[in-house]
Amino acid sequence: ATEDLTVVTTMMESRHLAGDTGLIEALAVIINPSAMWPPNDFIRGKLSEQQNRHDRYSNTEYALEPNIKSSPGGLRDLQVIEWITLRCFGNGLSDVNEPDFLSETERDQLRNGQEFLSQVRFALHNMTGRADDRLLFDHQKKLAALWGMVDGDTLAVEQFMQVYYRWMKT
């Protein structure tokens, strides 16, 4: 498990829900940065995973019908930032007070972007009746209507996707 970055990341996100608190405390000792995956190695590993994912989802097909979770700027990128802050500072993004890492404005932008993308993802899952993260053309039109956008000088679907891409660039 200590060799696998995905397993380490999953263990980092563990939290006490019920039962013996000593177990979660013991896990925290085992997975602390000095015990395995020091922060610099962890960051390099996560950025390598991110680059591989970006390479996979950066083609034209995904530019026009992006994957909310995996396309560049999507929810997985926000999760990478969350994991890095957790690994380096011991706190999640919302609890980190490190101005040299992120300003309050940047943290707010990330939080707002995550909220928007999560809402779009939830709406898409609800609309399709399954865990589908791809914004296909038909879905884009329905989501634009759901967000209250109407055709004008710019089509509603274009308005929606402009908002979507602005958040993806955040």
What does each model-identified segment do?
Residues A1-T170:
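A nucleotide- and high-energy phosphate-metabolite-utilizing enzyme signature
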